[in-house]
């Protein structure tokens, strides 16, 4: 359904441009001078919030490099009927930005495990290791012990705050696991994934660590199968043995978690989640909505599976009950997986959903007492170019053919499963093909899975101490900013005054000039479509 909408959008925008309906006001220097003046006026009034932060939120767009951010902005605008680039993302309203250097200690191009250790625990680490220093070695169990490093979330819990993890991947995946786990192999999801030698040496699988390493108040995402004994039928897919429990130790980790605390609730579908969120007796909530990863948003059953924005809202509301504040980690994890598949449509629609979760959290919190950071763990070999006309679908074709006389999409990958060269020939691509949900953009090098990119990624910040996010920083700096703002170890003597008592939520500031411009663009697009329809009727 959404793929059909993108194709219609592509057609409409090309018609839009064929009639020359680029906003007339943009031809006048006054338009751009006024926009810059308004932005400058906002910047001149910007003052850092010098208090401590009661609440800490980290949004992690897995694989959301700067090219992905820009393409997401265009897609968000186009899905709203606009040309695209002028439409702001929710994260665009955050006033402080920086660049983060993402390399692992042992890899120039990183993975999500070592990077999670950096931005969550404050220490750079090795490839495929989580919650341990670089002294630990991949897959060597005995190098875990004595090399553990602890997340800011762990320190927040120790300080009396409530804590939560929300993700669209399995909750045992590399990024969320960085908040609670210590492991030398990111793939040790359950005991069934571990060698017997590691178990004998005392290493624990990630699912076990989820319920044993710390008291997490809210856990929302996928990953059911790693919590239940082998052969336990999945409640959603009881006839599919591939979705059944996989644990070899016969432990039911969900039951163990439920028995550990008062006020616990386990849910596995959207209806149960919404019911639990309205129950004041629920003080700890675990929601596992798929056996492994949650569905891509374009494939999500909206009545059965919660969106990332819905999970974020539930988490914020529940955690906000604690007068001492909270720490929340929210991951848009399938942005990364869409890119690995070489399928930009999946990656970018996930990123649009991720931005909607940021907007929801902004509506529910107050920047006076809540530090919110947005970043990525790494980038991807994803790019878009081709001198496309403004308003061309982000999934569309470049206006001119390549030297081989064939069309090509604006979006391309440096490597991945989209490699299509056959005896030196490359196929033509049509608008219909490039707009399909499952279309894999062409790649220069054949790989079964597209790789990460090694360039710096952006950090966006708002709230107390957000001004510390500046310049170009090592990725582990992120954890230190959050720990300092929250006066958490090792900054318990931060010397910061507590935040002012503000109860009203803050919402993203909307630029009135941008809003009016979007309205005009929508009207112009409508006029273009009506002209086309009228022309078609006359011809017929």
From Swiss-Prot:
The keyword Transmembrane does not apply. Keywords: Calcium, Cell membrane, Disulfide bond, Glycoprotein, GPI-anchor, Hydrolase, Lipoprotein, Magnesium, Membrane, Metal-binding, Signal, Zinc. Mg(2+) binds at residues 62, 175, 331. Binds 1 Mg(2+) ion. Ca(2+) binds at residues 236, 289-290, 305. It comes from the Eukaryota. Disulfide bonds join 141-203, 487-494. Its EC number is 3.1.3.1. The active site is at 112 (phosphoserine intermediate). GO terms for cellular component: external side of plasma membrane; plasma membrane. Pfam families: Alk_phosphatase. It is a lipid-anchor; GPI-anchor. Residues 512-540 form a propeptide. InterPro entries: Alkaline_phosphatase (IPR001952), Alkaline_phosphatase_AS (IPR018299), Alkaline_phosphatase_core_sf (IPR017850). Homodimer. This is Intestinal-type alkaline phosphatase 1.
